Amino acid sequence: LTCVKSNSIWFITSENCPAGQNLCFKRWQYISPRMYDFTR
């Protein structure tokens, strides 16, 4: 499973997140829906 994490608004990193995929994606989508769709 892939989880999207961000240290800042302009820097995006993807990491394996088997335990908290849903939480991580929901948090990222909440921060920036457009960037979330872009990373898909």
UniProtKB/Swiss-Prot annotation:
GO molecular function, one term: toxin activity
Domain of life: Eukaryota
Keyword terms of this UniProt record: Disulfide bond, G-protein coupled acetylcholine receptor impairing toxin, G-protein coupled receptor impairing toxin, Neurotoxin, Postsynaptic neurotoxin, Secreted, Toxin
S-S pairs: 3-24
CDD domains: TFP_snake_toxin (cd00206)
Record's GO cellular component terms: extracellular region
PTM statement from Swiss-Prot or TrEMBL: Contains 4 disulfide bonds.
One matching Pfam family: Toxin_cobra-type
Subcellular location: Secreted
Tissue expression per record: Expressed by the venom gland.
Gene3D superfamilies referenced in this protein's UniProt entry, alphabetically: CD59
Function: Binds irreversibly and specifically to M1 (CHRM1) muscarinic acetylcholine receptors, blocking further binding of antagonists and preventing the action of agonists.
Subunit-structure text: Monomer.
Protein family (similarity comment): Belongs to the three-finger toxin family. Short-chain subfamily. Aminergic toxin sub-subfamily.
Protein name (record): Muscarinic m1-toxin4
